[in-house]
Amino acid sequence: MSASLVGSEMCIRDSYTSDKISMGFRRLSIIDLDAGSQPIYNEDKSLVLMFNGEIYNYKDLRKELMEAGHKFYTQTDSEVLIHAFEEWGEDMLMKLRGMFGFAIHNTKDGSLFIARDFFGIKPMHYAMVDGSFVYASEIKSILEYPKYKKKFNHKALDNYLSFQYVVPPETFFEGIYCLLPGHYLWYRDGKVTTTRYFEATFK
């Protein structure tokens, strides 16, 4: 699936596999090129992160987390993310400034946490396929999943003919959804739940 994500010459292919989950990624490495290989782990390797994007305020967050006792082994913004999740859980999202789509797997309870930035600059899609949860930044990667049977989503066509736009979370492919901007997703015990964490306010 990750092979379908073709990027520039600077893109690096990363992967993680266990008996419960497989995670693949292609990323543009621009910070701490040698140490920034993914996946990124927390101290006891109970959390595994795959991350696409950039956290603008990662240095400030890193300092705060170090003061809280977290140990860092790289200068990357991705390592800041995993320690932030370990420290603050879902609440860490409101501390972030940047563009991002990331997934964190808990190796102890088997759960998967996925989040997308406030404004949806970085894409994220997901599907339940024959009892398995599949996610990717681009739909074409999910289409490569062997058990997914490509099927047109007529509901999306109705939206498009009415608005010239597919109303999210629907996509043109049946069973494939986009994670909305400013939302996070939990996959636990075979169930998917999505929650809005950010809503713009105007004063």
Where are these regions (language model features)?
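Positively charged, low-complexity/disordered segments
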Residues: M1-E9
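Cysteine-centered catalytic environments shared across enzyme families
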Residues: S8-E9, R13-K203
